[in-house]
A protein has these predicted regions:
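Bacterial N-terminal signal peptides
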Residues: 13-25
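N-terminal secretory signal peptides that target proteins for export/translocation
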Residues: 1-10
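Negatively charged
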Residues: 30-584
Length: 584
């Protein structure tokens, strides 16, 4: 990312303030602005407008709109009595009247986000429009009009800014929620600009087609340029992005951005190291990125998160990305909720044993058409598998039985909603896994043999087999002594009736809904140590056959037991010795 100067650093120049008393002589005649001046229109609600800029040679005049004759330009004078030390001009105004401000000369710095707080107390909302750009040279437009929510540039705005000395347009229009266009004539020259960091961030109405031909050949940072510009859908495939290194969050939240023509960037993005959230939330994005040269990338997480239509027009083959992920350590959420991605070509991605990837969290989560054969993937170094295949409803797990997952720490939700899951994972080494939460939730046909799994490191088994209606696996040798959370572990496992008598439950705190809906369950769990359990709410609800003798259970701090045995038609254990004094 290109370094950005603080709002407190203004470089050089003098600090001025000019107080102009305004006449109220009005005329219907339109104002004739000085052709060299930067002209803006304001409508303040208070008694002054604060204009933060710095210049070596500026002359200014501020007057009520339609006033004739307009006052002469005044030489700005140093204002030294500002207790907040703001670098700004202040002009006296009458509330709710419209004013014209003309600034003539080169402007070294202009920022509506000046330090001290005065600007934020109302002036930003007073700026209505840029009437004319003038001929002065701009040196720094970082945050120039940031958060001016009423600012508009229209087809009648005269000229364009002289940016020959300007390298930084960061945050220039950030938060300008009324802004629709900026370059009505299509003549902005950006050849010397280095960064467009967050230039149009949160500009919810911005969609200027004239920026399509901007020459950004020297821009290095497109970080957050259009972030949350929800209306933006300009075809910018002609942009020269060959020097860009940072595209993180460039189009994040651009709900209407289709990415038309971005295939042309294929050979131009080879310097980009950061694709974090580039297209996050671009729900209508539908271009083919498979030929993009991503060989320099180090960060690619969330790149296509929630890109619902990606791959809708044709099946995307990502085989060209193979061998180009050598610097990446995480593929987390890369294609999350890309429901049209089949995974074609990704079979070739992780063939090198020495790759650096340690996280596959939710990489294909929500890819409902995903069915790639990942037999050849080396996942030896991966620690985080959380949600990897979550909601991949067509995925059958082909080939992953041979994966070496010995370094895995999290497998929560890994196969949630994988109704087609058929692969037998009995030989997986899960001895380091702490998080099994929802791992196989909503896999109604699950029948895998887990009897040899070493789950001794497990901290949470919450919802692990939630909704696995056919599951009745042998778990008697599982060491669950470290786990605190068993919430809904076997919820609606209608066939489950495994022997759990050996389970050591000394660390258990939450067993609520643990066997809820287990119609066949009647295992002997009378020897369980439940002294630390605080929540047993609905623990056996709907266990129609359950009648274990739980009279020896001892609770020290049981706080919830609502509906604990509701629907247990044959349960008749004597629970009079239970300590329920803490139950709320």
């Amino acid at each position: 990312m290109v370094n950005r100067k603080s709002h407190w650093e203004w470089g050089y120049g003098c600090l001025f303030s000019l107080w102009l008393l305004l006449g109220v002589v009005c005329s219907a005649k339109a104002a004739n602005y000085d052709v060299n001046a930067f002209v803006t229109k304001w409508k303040p609600t208070g008694t002054q407008i604060v204009v933060p800029f710095e210049s070596q040679n500026a002359q200014v005049r501020c007057y009520e709109a339609n006033t004739t004759p307009v006052p002469a330009f005044g030489a700005a004078q140093k204002y030294s009595n500002d207790p907040k030390n703001n670098m700004c001009f202040k002009f006296s105004t009458t509330p709710n009247k419209t004013y014209i401000l003309e600034i003539k000369g080169d402007i070294d710095k202009f920022s509506m986000s000046a330090p001290g707080g005065e600007v934020a107390q109302g002036t930003v909302n007073a700026l209505l429009s840029i009437e004319q750009w003038g001929t002065g040279k701009w040196r720094n437009l970082n945050s120039a009009f940031a958060n001016c929510i009423n600012l508009e540039i229209s087809s009648t705005t005269k000229g364009e800014p002289d940016l020959t000395l300007c390298e930084d347009l960061s945050y220039m229009f950030k938060g300008c929620s009324s802004l629709k266009i900026v370059d009505p004539q299509g003549k902005w020259k950006l050849q010397n600009v280095r960064t467009l960091l967050a230039m149009f961030e949160d500009c919810s109405q911005f969609n200027d087609p004239k920026i399509a031909n901007w020459d950004i050949r020297n821009v290095e940072t497109l970080n957050r340029t259009f972030c949350r510009a929800t209306s933006f859908n300009v075809k910018i495939d002609n942009w020269e992005v060959g020097k860009v290194t940072n595209m993180s969050q460039t189009f994040q939240g651009c709900l209407n951005f289709k990415g038309e023509g971005l295939e042309k960037w294929a050979t131009k993005v080879n310097r980009v190291t950061n694709f974090y959230c580039t297209f996050y939330g671009c729900k209508t994005l539908n271009f083919d990125p498979t030929d993009w040269n991503i060989e320099s990338v180090t960060l690619i997480t969330y790149m296509f998160y929630d890109c619902w239509l990606l791959g809708a027009s044709k099946n995307l083959d990502f085989s060209n990305w193979a061998g180009k992920l050598k610097k990446v350590t995480s593929l987390s959420n890369l294609f999350t909720n890309c429901s049209n991605i089949t995974g074609q070509g990704v079979e070739q991605w992780l063939l090198d044993k020495n790759h650096k990837i340690v996280s596959l969290e939710s990489t294909f989560s929500g890819c409902k058409r995903f069915k790639a054969d990942l037999t050849a993937w080396h996942v030896d170094n991966v620690e985080n598998f959380y949600g990897l295949f979550n909601n991949c409803i067509e995925y059958d797990g082909k080939g992953i039985a041979k994966w070496k997952v010995g370094n895995a720490v999290s497998m929560g939700a890994m196969f949630r909603y994988c109704g087609n899951m058929k692969e037998d994972l009995k030989d997986w080494d899960v001895s380091k896994v702490k998080n099994f939460q929802g791992m196989f939730a909503y896999c109604p046909g699950l029948k895998t043999d887990f009897s040899k799994w070493d789950v001794g490191a497990g901290i949470t088994f919450r919802k692990m087999f939630y909704g696995c209606s056919s599951f009745n696996g042998d778990l008697q040798n599982w060491d669950v002594s470290q786990s605190t959370d068993f919430y809904a572990m076997f919820f609606q496992c209608a066939s489950f009736n495994a022997d759990l008598s050996r389970w050591r439950m000394r660390s258990a705190i939450n067993t609520s809904s643990m066997f809820s809906g287990c119609k066949a369950f009647n295992a002997d769990i009378s020897s369980w140590n439940v002294e630390n359990v605080t929540d047993a709410n609905a623990m056996f609800i709907g266990c129609e056959k359950f009648n274990a003798n739980l009279s020896r259970w001892r609770f020290k701090n049981l706080q919830r037991m609502d509906n604990m045995f509701n629907g247990c038609k044959v349960f008749n254990a004597d629970l009079r010795r239970w300590d329920v004094s803490h139950v709320k």
